[in-house]
UniProtKB/Swiss-Prot annotation:
Designated name of the protein: F-box protein SKIP22
Renumbered residue ranges of the record's region Disordered: 114-133
Entry note about domains: The F-box is necessary for the interaction with ASK proteins.
Complex and partners: Part of a SCF (ASK-cullin-F-box) protein ligase complex. Interacts with SKP1A/ASK1 and SPK1B/ASK2.
Lineage: Eukaryota, Viridiplantae, Streptophyta, Embryophyta, Tracheophyta
Origin species: Arabidopsis thaliana
Gene: SKIP22
The entry's keywords: Nucleus, Ubl conjugation pathway
GO CC term, one of those recorded: nucleus
Length: 475
C-alpha cells in the first residue's frame, strides 16, 4: 500500500510504501524511529488520526493506496535523516533545483523534468544508511505527486477499472459493437449476474454477438446442471448504424425492456479508459463522468429492471430499490413531490396507487399549489384528489388558451373575412413612374385592408390601397 505523506508546515510531500498489515504505530515509527509518539497524523490537517486499538491496521481505518496523510512533529523533534551539508544545498538552489525535505529523509529532486534528464549525477544520498533495516521513502516533486494523487484517486473508482479488466480479459475484436456489448456485460457482472451456458474460453463475443441471446442468472439460482430449468434473463444486441439497441427479457415472458446506446458518445470514452497512459494523465473528470453516465444508464434502464424481474419470478429478495423502503419513508417521499409527480407515481404499481390515494396528502398539495385557495369545507367528505385534478385541468386549459391566442392573434389572417387580426397599414415602396397617368408619387404608400383607391386616375391597385397614410379621415 502506497501512501502520500505531506508535512503540515512545509507542505513538502513524498511517497511511502507500507504493508497492508502495518498499523498506525508502524507508520509513526517509519517517520521517527526514536520517538514515534512525537508524530501526529491527520487526514484533514485538523483532527488527529487515532485508532481504538493499537493492533488496528491502516486498512481497518479506511486507508487505501493513494491516500494523502498530513504529519507534524512535536517541537524539538526531528527525524534521523540529514542533508549532506549546507554548501551542497546552496549550490543546488543556485542551479534552480529545489530541495524537498521531509521528516523521514532529505533528498534533492529537480522541479523541472528536463533538468533531471540533463543532470544524471543528481542522486539521493543517505549518509547514515538504512535505519533499522528500513528503506527510506521515495521523494517526489509536489506538482508531480498531486498529478499522481489525482490518478490514484481515479483508480479507486471501481466501475471504470472493473470495466477495463473485463475488456482486457476478453480483448480481441475491437469493433464498436463488441466494445459496447462487453461494457454492458461488465455492468451485468458487477450487478450480480453470471453468464449462463457460455464459458469464457468458448464464447466469442465478436462472432456470436448478433446471432444469440446472452443468458444471465444469479449464483443462488444455480442448483442443477440442467440450465433449461434455471430462471434466467436474456440480453440481445441489435446494430443499427450509429446506435446499438439492447433488449432484455426475463425468462420466457413477453414483456421486455430496451435501451439505445450511441456509439459516437460512449465508444471513444471507453477506448480512453482502455488506454492506461491516457487515463492516468487525464484521470479526470470528463472521461470518468461519461463512463459513470454510461454505467448508470445501463444499470437503471436495463440491469435493475431485469434484476427485479428475476428476483420476483424466483421468489428472491428484491435488490435495493424504492419499493423496499418502509411505508413511512415512501409517504415522506411522496409529500416532497409536486401533485403531478404523485399522479405519475400512482401509475407504477398497486402499492404506490394505494399510498398516493391518501386524502390528507392531496389536501396538502391543494394548499401548496392552488393560488388563493381557501378551505371552506371540513371533514373527510371532500375528495381533495378530485379537487386537485379539477384545478390542474383548469390550469392546463388556461395555459393552452393563452398559447392559442398568442399564436392566432398576432398577424394571422381570418379565413372568413380575409383580414388580418391587427389593423395597421403595411408599408410598401414607391410605385413605378408609369402608374397614375405619368404622375409619380413620392413617398411610401400605406395599404389598409378593405379600403378602395380614390383620386388615383380611377385605377384600382389590387382592390386594397390608399395613397400615403390614413390618419383617421373618411373613406
Amino acid at each position: 500500500m502506497k501512501l502520500r505523506l505531506r508535512h503540515h508546515e512545509t507542505r513538502e510531500t513524498l511517497k511511502l510504501e507500507l504493508a497492508d498489515a502495518d498499523t498506525l504505530h508502524d507508520l509513526r515509527r517509519r517517520i521517527n524511529p526514536t520517538v514515534p509518539s512525537s508524530v501526529h497524523l491527520s487526514l484533514n490537517r485538523k483532527d488527529e488520526l487515532i485508532t481504538p486499538s493499537p493492533e488496528d491496521t491502516l486498512r481497518s481505518l479506511g486507508l487505501i493506496s493513494g491516500d494523502l496523510i498530513y504529519f507534524s512533529l512535536e517541537a524539538g523533534e526531528s527525524s534521523n535523516w540529514k542533508l549532506r551539508d549546507s554548501e551542497t544545498v546552496a549550490s543546488q538552489s543556485e542551479s534552480n533545483q529545489t530541495s524537498v525535505h521531509d521528516s523521514i529523509g532529505f533528498a534533492e529532486v529537480d522541479v523541472v523534468p528536463d533538468q533531471a534528464k540533463s543532470n544524471p549525477n543528481t542522486s539521493v544520498e543517505d549518509p547514515e544508511g538504512d535505519i533499522s533495516g528500513m528503506e527510506g521513502p521515495e521523494p517526489m516533486d509536489v506538482e508531480q505527486l498531486d498529478m499522481e494523487l489525482a490518478a490514484a484517486g481515479s483508480k479507486r473508482l471501481s466501475e471504470p477499472f472493473f470495466l477495463k479488466n473485463i475488456l482486457l480479459e476478453k480483448s480481441g475484436d475491437t469493433s464498436e459493437l463488441t466494445t459496447l456489448a462487453l461494457s454492458v456485460h461488465a455492468v451485468m457482472l458487477e450487478s450480480g449476474f453470471v453468464l449462463l451456458n457460455h464459458g469464457s474460453d468458448k464464447f466469442n463475443f465478436s462472432k456470436e454477438l448478433l446471432t444469440v441471446s446472452l443468458r444471465y442468472t444469479l449464483p443462488e439460482l444455480i442448483k442443477s446442471k440442467d440450465t433449461n430449468t434455471i430462471e434466467s434473463v436474456s440480453v440481445k444486441f441489435q446494430n443499427l448504424g450509429p446506435v446499438v439497441v439492447v433488449y432484455g427479457t426475463v425468462g420466457g415472458s413477453s414483456g421486455r425492456v430496451h435501451m439505445n446506446l450511441d456509439k459516437r458518445r460512449f465508444v471513444p470514452v471507453i477506448d480512453l479508459v482502455m488506454d492506461t497512459s491516457t487515463s492516468d494523465e487525464e484521470g479526470s473528470s470528463s472521461i470518468y463522468r461519461e463512463v459513470f453516465m454510461f454505467w448508470r444508464m445501463v444499470k437503471d434502464r436495463l440491469v435493475i429492471p431485469l434484476l427485479i424481474g428475476i428476483c420476483d419470478k424466483a421468489g428472491l429478495e428484491p435488490p435495493p430499490c424504492l419499493m423496499r423502503l418502509p411505508t413511512e419513508l415512501k409517504l415522506k417521499i411522496l409529500e416532497l413531490l409536486p401533485g403531478v409527480s404523485i399522479g405519475n407515481m400512482a401509475c407504477v404499481c398497486t402499492e404506490m396507487r394505494y399510498l398516493a390515494s391518501d386524502n390528507d396528502l392531496w389536501k396538502q398539495k391543494c394548499l401548496e399549489e392552488v393560488n388563493n385557495f381557501v378551505v371552506t369545507e371540513a371533514g373527510d367528505s371532500v375528495n381533495w384528489k378530485a379537487r386537485f385534478a379539477t384545478f390542474w385541468r383548469q390550469k392546463q386549459l388556461a395555459a393552452a388558451s393563452d398559447t392559442f391566442w398568442r399564436q392566432n392573434q398576432l398577424g394571422r389572417r381570418n379565413i372568413s373575412t380575409g383580414r388580418s387580426g391587427i389593423r395597421f397599414p403595411r408599408i410598401i415602396g414607391d410605385p413605378p413612374f408609369t402608374w397614375f397617368n405619368g404622375d409619380r408619387m413620392h413617398g411610401s404608400i400605406g395599404i389598409h385592408p378593405g379600403q378602395s383607391a380614390r383620386g388615383l386616375g380611377r385605377r384600382t391597385w389590387g382592390q386594397l390601397f390608399t395613397p400615403r397614410c390614413n390618419l383617421g379621415g373618411l373613406n
